[in-house]
A protein has these predicted regions:
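Short acidic-glycine-tyrosine-enriched beta hairpin
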Residues: 21, 88-106
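Hydrophobic small-molecule pocket/channel-lining residues, especially in calycin-type beta-barrels
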Residues: 62, 68-69, 82, 98, ...
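Long, hydrophobic/aromatic N-terminal blocks
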Residues: 1-40
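A short glycine-rich, His/Asp/Glu-containing loop-to-beta-strand
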Residues: 25-65, 71-72
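Short, charged/polar surface micro-motifs in flexible loops or helix N-caps
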Residues: 44-47, 57-61, 81-83, 90, ...
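Ligand-binding loop in jelly-roll beta-barrel domains
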Residues: 83, 103-130
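Acidic/histidine-enriched, glycine/proline-rich intrinsically disordered or flexible terminal extensions
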Residues: 130-162
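Short, conserved beta-strand element in jelly-roll/cupin
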Residues: 53-57, 67-86, 122-124
Length: 162
């Protein structure tokens, strides 16, 4: 494997880094009390990737097994215990554990420990996942979509349930 073709060919380099302080408020609070920090969105990275810090409350939460056709996802546990599904088995993910899921890989995550837990979620390329998570939070809070609208929503957001 070699490096990709250059995406920048200037000589002096650029001062274009983006800094986000640790105390930045979360962009999303779920009905369960968990929060999401959009550390880097697909928009802010020019579509290269997205990176979220996902803080799960003690209440059980997390999606059912599913897959994506257009993005890979990676999960890195920072604190607590998070159940990670690798397509065949649920694994107790503890701090420092990592799960990479290529496109098409069935996966899921849950917090059933009764304690808060935190992980990083990285997806590439940088799809606009913010609307997906914000809408599913509203659905968990009582938003009702027709079966047709719900099916279209999941397809639009590259989520296929298993």
């Amino acid at each position: 494997m070699s490096y990709p073709e250059p995406r920048y060919d200037g000589e002096p380099g650029m001062a274009n880094a983006r800094f986000r302080p640790a105390d930045h408020a979360p962009e999303l609070t779920n009905p369960s009390g968990g929060t999401a920090h959009y550390l880097a969105t697909g928009e802010s990275t020019g579509g290269q990737f997205g990176l979220y810090r996902w803080e799960m409350a003690a209440a059980p939460s997390g999606p059912k097994p599913h897959f994506h056709r257009t993005i890979s996802e990676s999960f890195y546990v920072l604190s607590g215990t998070i159940l990670l599904f690798d397509g065949t088995a649920w694994i107790d993910g503890e701090p420092g554990d990592f799960l990479f899921v290529p496109e098409g890989g069935i996966h899921a995550f849950r917090n059933e420990s009764g304690e808060p837990a935190t992980m990083l979620i990285l997806f590439a390329p940088g799809a606009p996942r913010e609307d997906y998570f914000e809408t599913t939070a509203r659905m968990a809070g009582g938003l009702v979509l027709s079966d047709e609208d719900k099916a279209a929503f999941y397809v639009r957001h590259d989520t296929y349930w298993r």
